Regions:
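Catalytic core of pol beta-like nucleotidyltransferases
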Residues: 1-22, 30-36, 47-106
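Short beta-strand->loop micro-motif that forms the acidic, two-metal-ion catalytic signature
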Residues: 41-45
């Protein structure tokens, strides 16, 4: 499985749960510097109207526990927050936008 090839069913499950506008792969897999035990770091860019529960990491990770077992970590963020912080050095969204790859978009 290549660096950008997610485990089967990952995007479908994220779309089912969060209905994101985009999903970005970032981190070592996006940079292609991953090792055999590296996880998949994903940022799910949600619509601005997304409910707060869809942004709560404990809730999201609990609902996606089957993905966590595959070492897939999903960080949710609202579109406006992603767009505002993607140009601010030091923000996670900036690193995602700079080195990441969109693996899902609608």
């Amino acid at each position: 499985m290549g660096a950008l090839a997610l485990p089967p069913g990952v995007i479908e499950r994220i779309v089912e749960l969060l209905a994101p506008e985009e999903v970005w792969l970032f981190g070592s897999r996006a940079r292609e510097t991953h090792g055999p035990d590296s996880d998949w770091d994903l940022m799910a860019v949600l619509p601005d109207a997304a409910p707060d529960r869809d942004l709560d990491l404990a809730t999201v990770w609990g609902n996606l526990r089957e993905l966590r077992r595959m070492r897939v970590e999903v960080i949710p963020i609202r579109r406006r927050d992603f767009d505002e912080s993607r140009t601010t050095l030091g923000e996670l969204a900036e690193a995602v936008a700079r080195e990441g790859h969109v693996v899902y978009g609608r």
